[in-house]
């Protein structure tokens, strides 16, 4: 398995092969999981959840200065290079309305919808751009894990966490009066049902030669709770609901964004965006190794209003 391809964003820190000696120096525990792949290069068993957790811990220490990171068993353990790409592509989106300059610092505020136990997007966004984050989730266990990560790294001023109390809503009832965000991020549940998630997991296990029939929900890149992997109606329903709810926050968010894994969902999403009255829509392809994805972004502000948003933020800095 080759973890990185040249399709990564130019600012992504994970170009080329992983530097295992540096990673092991940063986190010596990685040494016991390091193997030699069929090409004679150091690697890990990417089907081993514990190995991937330790590997991520080493990456975050060595590349981002995150000293403490862990997640509960059976929660999603994210592939960091792909997650970083989303942050960088979103940063470029903000730069487009800001004379080509990526806005940095605490004046930029992002909302991560479904922050998860791993808290990965706020960690990467803060490390690379010093943005402030609000992370939301419906799962109190995930939020407790994310809170432990934030506190252990002294990031309480940069990253705030909040539970979405109504599982039927995404944005509605979450934001407080007067809150404004430059950006929302979302990596929506991919599958439409538990059975579909299970089948997808088993296919990936089979491809890795590690299928485990004893699990009710096999590890899928590399773990994942039900609400992380599937929701009723799948990705298309989640994103179209997000679009519908975003209308009520049209003046309080500069850019709404979401990842979309299935290209076949794009026509339905584009139709929902047209119906919503969004004044700007972007679909940006993202290639990460063997996986192809894309970021869908929309704004209810026209070009002049978006540029004025950046100017106002600068005046308040």
Curated annotation (Swiss-Prot):
<dbReference type="Pfam" id="PF05971">
    <property type="entry name" value="Methyltransf_10"/>
</dbReference>
<dbReference type="InterPro" id="IPR029063">
    <property type="entry name" value="SAM-dependent_MTases_sf"/>
</dbReference>
<keyword id="KW-0808">Transferase</keyword>
<dbReference type="InterPro" id="IPR010286">
    <property type="entry name" value="METTL16/RlmF"/>
</dbReference>
<keyword id="KW-0698">rRNA processing</keyword>
<dbReference type="GO" id="GO:0052907">
    <property type="term" value="F:23S rRNA (adenine(1618)-N(6))-methyltransferase activity"/>
</dbReference>
<keyword id="KW-0963">Cytoplasm</keyword>
<dbReference type="GO" id="GO:0005737">
    <property type="term" value="C:cytoplasm"/>
</dbReference>
<protein>
    <recommendedName>
        <fullName>Ribosomal RNA large subunit methyltransferase F</fullName>
        <ecNumber>2.1.1.181</ecNumber>
    </recommendedName>
</protein>
<dbReference type="InterPro" id="IPR016909">
    <property type="entry name" value="rRNA_lsu_MeTfrase_F"/>
</dbReference>
<comment type="similarity">
    <text>Belongs to the methyltransferase superfamily. METTL16/RlmF family.</text>
</comment>
<comment type="function">
    <text>Specifically methylates the adenine in position 1618 of 23S rRNA.</text>
</comment>
<dbReference type="GO" id="GO:0070475">
    <property type="term" value="P:rRNA base methylation"/>
</dbReference>
<keyword id="KW-0489">Methyltransferase</keyword>
<keyword id="KW-0949">S-adenosyl-L-methionine</keyword>
């Amino acid at each position: 398995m080759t973890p990185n391809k040249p399709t990564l964003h130019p600012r992504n820190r994970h170009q080329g092969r992983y530097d295992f000696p540096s990673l092991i120096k940063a986190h010596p525990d990685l040494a016991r999981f390091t193997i030699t792949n069929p090409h004679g290069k150091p690697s890990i068993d990417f089907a081993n959840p514990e190995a991937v957790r330790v590997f991520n811990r080493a990456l975050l220490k060595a590349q981002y200065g995150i000293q403490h990171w862990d997640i509960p068993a059976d929660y999603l353990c994210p592939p960091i290079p792909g997650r970083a790409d989303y942050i960088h592509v979103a940063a470029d989106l903000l730069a487009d309305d800001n004379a080509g300059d990526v806005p940095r610092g605490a004046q930029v505020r992002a909302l991560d919808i479904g922050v998860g136990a791993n808290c990965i997007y706020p960690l990467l966004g803060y490390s690379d751009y010093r943005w402030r984050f609000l992370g939301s989730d419906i799962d109190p266990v995930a939020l407790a894990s994310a809170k432990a990560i934030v506190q252990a790294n002294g990031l309480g001023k940069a990253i705030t966490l909040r539970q979405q109390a109504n599982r039927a809503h995404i944005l509605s009832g979450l934001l407080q009066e007067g809150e404004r965000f430059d950006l929302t991020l979302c990596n929506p549940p991919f599958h439409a049902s538990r059975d579909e998630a299970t089948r997808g997991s088993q296919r990936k296990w089979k491809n890795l030669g590690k299928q485990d029939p004893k699990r009710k929900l096999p590890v899928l890149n590399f773990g994942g709770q039900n609400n992380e992997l599937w929701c009723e109606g799948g990705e298309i329903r989640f994103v179209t609901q997000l679009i519908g709810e975003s209308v009520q926050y049209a003046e309080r968010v500069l850019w709404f964004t979401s990842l979309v894994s299935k290209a076949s969902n794009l026509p339905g999403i584009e139709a929902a965006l047209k119906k919503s009255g969004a004044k700007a829509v972007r679909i940006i392809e993202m290639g990460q190794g063997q996986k192809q994805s894309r970021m869908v972004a929309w704004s209810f502000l026209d070009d002049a209003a978006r540029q004025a948003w950046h100017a106002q933020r600068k005046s308040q800095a």
